[in-house]
Structure formats: structure tokens, C-alpha cells
From Swiss-Prot:
Catalytic activity: GTP + H2O = GDP + phosphate + H(+)
Broad class of the protein's primary localization: cytoplasm
Positions of post-translational Phosphoserine modification: S241
Gene name in the database record: Rab34
Gene3D superfamilies per UniProt: P-loop containing nucleotide triphosphate hydrolases
Motif Switch 1: where in chain: 71-89
Name of the protein in its database record: Ras-related protein Rab-34
Lineage summary: Eukaryota, Metazoa, Chordata, Craniata, Vertebrata
Family (UniProt): Belongs to the small GTPase superfamily. Rab family.
Amino acid sequence: MNILAPVRRDRVLAELPQCLKKEAALHVRKDFHPRVTCACQEHRTGTVGFKISKVIVVGDLSVGKTCLINRFCKDTFDKNYKATIGVDFEMERFEVLGVPFSLQLWDTAGQERFKCIASTYYRGAQAIIIVFNLNDVASLEHSKQWLADALKENDPSNVLLFLVGSKKDLSTPAQYSLMEKDALKVAQEIKAEYWSVSSLTGENVREFFFRVAALTFEANVLAELEKSGSRHIGDVVRINSDDKNLYLTASKKKATCCP
């Protein structure tokens, strides 16, 4: 018996959501990896549809982690600030290329006294979202330490990284432009995909989480194909900050069908 909630109509992905900035993206292709598309069409995605992929959200106190998750999952925004104690999580169900896919979004505390508690839940993440306040330079500077802490419990080669600037609605165009330049540099340094959002207005929130779901799904299917004996895992999802071509290709052969 399937105990998971049914997929909502607004959580169905038939195509790959695009990145926000090509200069800081995990990859810039317009479509899903050909082998992923083929595997979905042939119903050869293995156990991907039954797995729950863990996504952890980290960052300084009051940068807007909870508001970001609540805006996407519940379409709400609470102006009354309440600090997260320890950890909390939300489950989101998607359908990607006809395959059910689940994300578990872990909202972690940014307070120092809860850091030890929160860090125990970092392990097993398939994606790490580092949130900073677009109006607070210090929160951006701290993002590298948050990443370092999260990677202590995870294999860096097996997680997707996202750097998200929050509270865009509070920034003037001039302020945002300056902060974005710094944020893009950090994103390139840590090999993360950059996004800017506003949980108050909802700007880019839905697009961002759809992108997270799609790329996590893609990585899961490619891993499943590799596990099942595929000879070529395809494209490696990582930024190459030393090359204009941000998408590193493990194999330049165009796959037309799954082996």
C-alpha cells in the first residue's frame, strides 16, 4: 500500500526548469540528460520513485530559511519571526517526467546553541541549500562555514549545492546589484548554483524549488543507471570555474537510448 501523499497538479514537471544565472549554475542545458529522459520513457528508473531524497537548508539565524520553505510548501508568509529550535522538516511530492519523486526539506536552526543538534541531521543529504540575507554581507561570508559543517557529514561528490539569497524585496536595485556580484563569486568558489528569492512576494521561490527537485531527480536517475550496470554515467553536475563551459562532460557522445 502506498502511504505517500498523491502528487499535486502544481508539482508536475514535464521539462527541466532553467537556472537563474548561467555564470553560477550546476549545468546550463535546456533539457534533462538524454539518458534520464530515455529511462523515464522506458520505465527504467529503478527505485527512484520509491525513495525520499533529503535536502538540508542551512544558514545564519533569521536569514529566512523557514519562510522560504513555508512559502513553497504552504504558500504562506509569517511576518512574526520565530526561531527554529533544532530541526523541522516538510515533505514535498513531485512527478518528474512521469515518475513520482519525493523531497524531504530539512529546516535547521541557525542559532549557535542549536548547531550541534542540527548538525546531527545533516548526514545523508543529496542537496544542500545555503541561505543568506541579501541585505547582510556577514551572512554571505558565513555561508562557506555552513557548507563546511554540512560537508563533514556528507560526501562532497554526491551532493548538489545551492546558494540562495533571501529577502530580495528589501534590497534596492543598487544594493542588490552589488550583493549579487559578491554572491556569484562565492557560488563559483563553492561550486553551487545561485538563486535570489523573496519569500514575502514569492519571487523565484517556486522556480527555485522546482529546479532543486529536477536536478536532484536527474542525479538520482543517473546514479540508478550507473548502479544497474550502465557503462557511462553521463554528465557530471559540477561548476568548472576555470572554464567558460560550466558543464563538464564525462562523455561527449549523445545518447539516444538507454543501454
